């Protein structure tokens, strides 16, 4: 079901400033920047080996803006890459509560879904199914 850790999400107030920090301090390079309307965020992906650092700046009301207002900038979620997100949600949904009963559109044509954090020891947990070759 789970292939690997896909990315670690970090909420930021200003995406350009955050990119500069991660570039200047850690030497990371931006692979992709895009806007995901479904989640009202602008995101940047910075590869670290096979895992991505995902910087998220809210651009409207939603989960990310709520998180920023309540907690400030910082670690937001961990995302696991799955081979079949529908099957993963069906299996995991028998064991814990799902925030998303069905996958939603994510960045780069992916499909994503979140679990309820309470069932995951208060860790915001996401599944992603990427297009073949992505």
Can you say where each PLM-predicted feature lies in the sequence?
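A cross-kingdom feature marking solvent-exposed beta-strand/loop segments within repeated
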Residues: 4-6, 28-40, 59-76, 91-112
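Vicinal oxygen chelate
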Residues: 44-45, 80, 89-134
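Short coil/turn motifs at helix boundaries and re-entrant loops, enriched in small/polar
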Residues: 9, 52, 71-88, 121-122
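C-terminal "cap" of GNAT-fold acetyltransferases
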Residues: 36-51
């Amino acid at each position: 079901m789970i292939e690997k850790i896909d990315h670690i999400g970090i909420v930021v107030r200003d995406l350009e400033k955050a990119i500069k920090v991660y570039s200047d301090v850690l030497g990371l390079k931006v692979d992709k920047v895009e806007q995901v309307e479904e989640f009202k965020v602008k995101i940047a992906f910075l590869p670290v080996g096979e895992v991505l650092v995902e910087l998220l700046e809210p651009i409207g009301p939603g989960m990310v803006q709520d998180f920023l207002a309540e907690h400030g900038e910082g670690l937001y979620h961990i995302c696991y890459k799955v081979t079949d997100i529908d099957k993963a949600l069906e299996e995991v949904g028998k064991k814990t509560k799902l925030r998303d009963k069905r996958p939603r559109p994510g960045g780069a044509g992916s499909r994503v879904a979140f679990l309820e954090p309470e069932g995951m020891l208060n860790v915001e947990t996401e599944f992603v199914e990427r297009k073949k070759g992505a």
